């Protein structure tokens, strides 16, 4: 492997802040005549450090690698994060992994990034170790569009509050989840709005807040996106108790059971609520569909979004 200019992190979601940092790595590599690299991990470190931790991921590993490939970085290195890696001090990690294994000569880190056992050391420590090891350590500037901090945690907060448009602006693309279609209760079909029911237990990513959303949908192994509306919640009109994800695809008919579906969230239309009757719910769904089609016809342009990378 050639000498590297690298950055390191979990890069969940590969959002605009991550890509700002990666662009800095690529520029420095080109200026220095080296190769650029992103070093990441196959799982969230807290999954190893806290055995009961369930991460609210913005992207699966496969999706993260796809997103990273679109940055045009020369190399992506995925480290297996286990107890032995977690036990390495920052100095040991820089010597054993960065210098000896990967031949990193310049390390560019985010302004708030820490690594090494217990993340107990900081930038000045990394600079000192780097001088001993022949690794120049550089702290990248913060990415603050409109004075807003872009981070995975901020994006998760947006999604938990149903603010998918805010999340998408920070991501730089439409937030997308993946899951398998399973059999449902057929309630939507009876109302004239047949739905594909997604397996909540298989979805590895954070679900947005309960509500009705304008979405774009496609089968994982196909091309072309279809408009749709998705409900996330507990189906209160039908006295449901467990969380469900149901998506109605516009202008589509066919059997989708067992297939993997990608769903991109465009905008939240309304909160989920209990209706007095099924007819009242059906009437509201028709209004929702009209509103969603109007959104797609007037304000949303798919070519302006990175949804095409999925």
Regions found by a protein language model. Give the residues of each.
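N-terminal catalytic cores of NTP/NDP-binding nucleotidyl/phosphoryl-transfer enzymes
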Residues: 1-60
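Residue-level signal for inorganic ion chemistry
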Residues: 15, 68, 107, 167, ...
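Glycine-rich, highly charged phosphate/nucleotide-binding loops
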Residues: 56-64, 88-94
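A glycine-rich helix N-cap at a beta->alpha junction
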Residues: 60-77
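Classical nucleotidyltransferase
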Residues: 84-194, 276-280, 305-306
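Phosphate/ribose-recognition catalytic cores of enzymes acting on nucleotide-derived substrates
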Residues: 184-310
């Amino acid at each position: 492997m050639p000498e590297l200019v690298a950055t390191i992190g979990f890069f969940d979601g590969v959002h605009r802040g991550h890509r700002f940092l990666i662009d800095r790595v690529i520029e420095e590599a080109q200026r220095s005549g080296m190769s650029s690299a992103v070093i990441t991990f196959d799982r969230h470190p807290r999954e190893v450090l806290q055995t009961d931790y369930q991460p609210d991921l913005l992207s699966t590993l496969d999706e993260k690698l796809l997103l990273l490939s679109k940055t045009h970085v020369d190399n992506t290195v995925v480290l297996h994060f286990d107890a032995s890696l977690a036990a390495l001090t920052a100095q040991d990690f820089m010597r054993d992994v960065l210098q000896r294994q990967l031949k990193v000569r310049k390390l560019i880190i985010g302004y708030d990034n820490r690594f090494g056992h217990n993340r107990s050391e900081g930038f000045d420590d990394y600079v000192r170790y780097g001088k001993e090891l022949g690794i120049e350590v550089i702290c990248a500037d913060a990415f603050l569009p409109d004075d807003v901090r872009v981070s995975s945690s901020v994006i998760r907060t947006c999604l938990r509050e149903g603010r998918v448009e805010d999340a998408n602006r920070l991501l730089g693309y439409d937030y997308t989840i993946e899951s398998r279609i399973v059999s449902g209760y057929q309630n939507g079909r009876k109302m004239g709005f047949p739905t594909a029911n997604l397996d909540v237990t298989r979805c590895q990513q954070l679900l947005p807040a309960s509500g009705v959303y304008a979405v774009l949908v496609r089968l994982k192994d196909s091309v072309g996106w279809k408009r749709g509306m998705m409900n996330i919640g507990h189906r209160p009109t039908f006295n449901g108790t467990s969380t469900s994800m149901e998506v109605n695809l516009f202008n589509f008919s066919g059997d989708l059971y067992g297939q993997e579906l990608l769903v991109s969230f465009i905008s939240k239309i309304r909160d989920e609520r209990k209706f007095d009757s099924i007819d009242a719910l059906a009437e509201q769904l028709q209004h929702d569909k009209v509103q969603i089609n109007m959104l797609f016809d007037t304000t949303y342009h798919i070519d302006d979004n990175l949804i095409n990378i999925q």
